[in-house]
């Protein structure tokens, strides 16, 4: 079986999409699948003009230069090859004449929903609205749409009228996250100084996008400040200007640490040392940090929105996304050793559902279903 795997444009720096594609490239050959990666070449995108024009140069690479390249690669591929678009935002590359042999992974439809006027904290410009509509049309040219979660599949069926074939294949862990010993944890945190070894902290992993709800986390920290001596670590992107302003207005600057683009070793150590993963997102398609934390024995406190309850299972304390006092109560409750240990055990049990081997086996079965006349 031959699969032509369509990857992302590298300058877009879509880390979660890169990790997903890397997992497929690494694991599929072990299941007898020959995988060939193809993605847009950076040509016009090498130039830096500024003034908002860089995005349009990238569009030339992605939407003008790449489609004929992909078409030629498909023509040269072995007969019966499957075309797998690894990120739904690239569904614009799907073709009507190849529908039965095209599969696309839909990680979420938040941007599409935002472009259609739904409240997802994903506003779209006029050009963005056109692109998101093109993405939705592209999804409907696939022979099979694989969604990361039931929540995302429900969105897909609703937006397309349930006319296209779809199924759920939940993501697997994207790295070897595990419980570390004290020595390994200290080594992983060494580059961040001693403060994270001396004081308890919550870790919030992800970008600074509005839907990640960092502002809510800062308000939680302000509520916790007189009752708990801990810190809040933002791992991922730096704080936006508005988030910095809110941090200062709430007078919690001395309690906030930002770790930008942590390595796997640093992130794993953060999970191992943290009082809990705080994950109050308003909208998600999956929620990888939840299972990463659970695999490391880190308690999880998260919101009850979109895919998060489905992913967290019984291994998290789950609250309404606007329930500040409830989140505070759950965070403080983890001082109870028995409650904490029970939650950690439930997390270990839950993460068994998300082994990469299971995800890969499901994708191989999906490929075979398309390859069979």
Model-derived segments and spans:
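Carbohydrate transferase catalytic cores enriched for Leloir-type hexosyltransferases
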Residues: 1-373
């Amino acid at each position: 079986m031959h699969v032509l795997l369509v990857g992302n444009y590298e300058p877009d720096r879509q880390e979660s999409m890169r990790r997903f594609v890397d997992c497929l490239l690494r694991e599929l050959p072990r299941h007898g699948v020959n995988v060939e990666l193809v993605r847009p070449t950076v040509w016009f995108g090498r130039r830096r003009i500024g003034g908002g024009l860089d995005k349009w140069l990238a569009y030339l690479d992605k939407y003008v230069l790449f489609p004929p390249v992909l078409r030629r690669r498909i023509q040269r591929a072995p007969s019966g090859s499957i075309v797998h678009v690894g990120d739904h935002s690239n569904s614009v590359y799907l073709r009507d004449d190849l529908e039965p042999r095209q599969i696309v992974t839909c990680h979420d439809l938040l941007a599409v929903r935002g472009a259609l006027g739904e409240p997802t904290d994903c506003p779209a410009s006029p050009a963005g609205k056109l692109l998101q509509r093109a993405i939705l049309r592209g999804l409907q040219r696939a022979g099979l749409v694989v969604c990361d979660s039931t929540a995302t599949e429900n969105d897909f069926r609703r937006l397309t009228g349930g006319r296209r074939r779809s199924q759920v294949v939940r993501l697997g862990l994207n790295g070897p996250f595990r419980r570390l010993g004290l020595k390994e944890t200290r080594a992983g945190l060494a580059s961040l100084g001693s403060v994270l070894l001396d004081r308890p902290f919550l870790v919030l992993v992800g970008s600074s996008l509005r839907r990640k709800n960092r502002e809510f986390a800062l308000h939680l920290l302000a509520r916790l400040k007189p009752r708990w001596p801990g810190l809040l670590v933002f791992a991922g992107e730096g704080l936006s200007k508005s988030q910095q302003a809110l941090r200062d207005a709430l007078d919690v600057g001395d309690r906030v640490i930002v770790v930008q683009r942590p390595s796997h070793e640093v992130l794993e150590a953060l999970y191992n040392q943290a009082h809990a993963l705080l994950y109050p997102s308003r909208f998600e398609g999956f929620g990888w940090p939840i299972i990463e934390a659970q695999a490391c024995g880190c308690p999880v406190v998260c919101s009850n929105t979109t895919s998060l309850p489905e992913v967290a299972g019984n291994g998290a304390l789950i609250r309404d996304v606007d329930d500040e006092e409830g989140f505070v109560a759950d965070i403080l409750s983890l001082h109870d050793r028995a409650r904490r240990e029970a939650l950690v055990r439930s997390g270990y049990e839950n993460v068994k559902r998300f082994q990469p081997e299971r995800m890969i086996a499901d994708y191989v079965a999906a490929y075979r279903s398309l390859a069979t006349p």
